[in-house]
Amino acid sequence: MKKAGLLFLVMIVIAVVAAGIGYWKLTGEESDTLRKIVLEECLPNQQQNQNPSPCAEVKPNAGYVVLKDLNGPLQYLLMPTYRINGTESPLLTDPSTPNFFWLAWQARDFMSKKYGQPVPDRAVSLAINSRTGRTQNHFHIHISCIRPDVREQLDNNLANISSRWLPLPGGLRGHEYLARRVTESELVQRSPFMMLAEEVPEAREHMGSYGLAMVRQSDNSFVLLATQRNLLTLNRASAEEIQDHQCEILR
């Protein structure tokens, strides 16, 4: 019993340290790097010179930019042209806010252009990390390849994913996930952030503790994946963990 108690105490200490490291990462100057790129470089250059550089695309009227990430050959980031920190922002559950996940899905074409040939939809994934699972304080959705093992697991669970948020059997990458099937028409009309906030009990009050991902299924539906921070299981809710920025799935 004493050993079990000691082990539990050690796990708590590790969890607290992990949380502290996550907080430390978000308090330095480097956590504002993406925001500075968007607001001080991409947006002004587009407005003054009709050149989105260093971004790949700038859409001021639509409220977003697309930037090639330095990590991985095909990874891109979709970000707002104004200040939104991350999943904790109440703006994401405001109906007037752009549907960033849908916009990010449209931006997957940048992967194909960079690759030099079409990247199959089944190889693409979108992900945004929780407040403690991210390293940047500017909202950004990762547009990148899906891990082959995650792709296989989702394919195998196609029949188990319904139009309600339910636990995904076995979770992903050692962490618990909720999964929800959505059609393209649903996705166009309603943001995944709103679906999560309105349909999962108490999620609205704790949106910053969630990481969210999206993948296309073989039946042309989409699956939304949500994981919530749980420091006792060392889950910082970094939904980006389902992605493979080296794109092994294309080899």
UniProtKB/Swiss-Prot annotation:
Q: Which SUPFAM superfamilies does the entry mention?
A: HIT-like
Signal peptide interval: none
| This enzyme's EC code(s) | 3.6.1.26
List the GO molecular function terms.
Answer: CDP-diacylglycerol diphosphatase activity
Q: Which GO terms describe its biological process?
A: CDP-diacylglycerol catabolic process; phospholipid biosynthetic process
Main location group? membrane
Q: What is this protein called?
A: CDP-diacylglycerol pyrophosphatase
Localization, per the record, is: Cell inner membrane
Q: Which gene encodes it?
A: cdh
The pathway noted for it is: Phospholipid metabolism; CDP-diacylglycerol degradation; phosphatidate from CDP-diacylglycerol: step 1/1
What is the protein's species of origin? Answer: Escherichia coli O157:H7
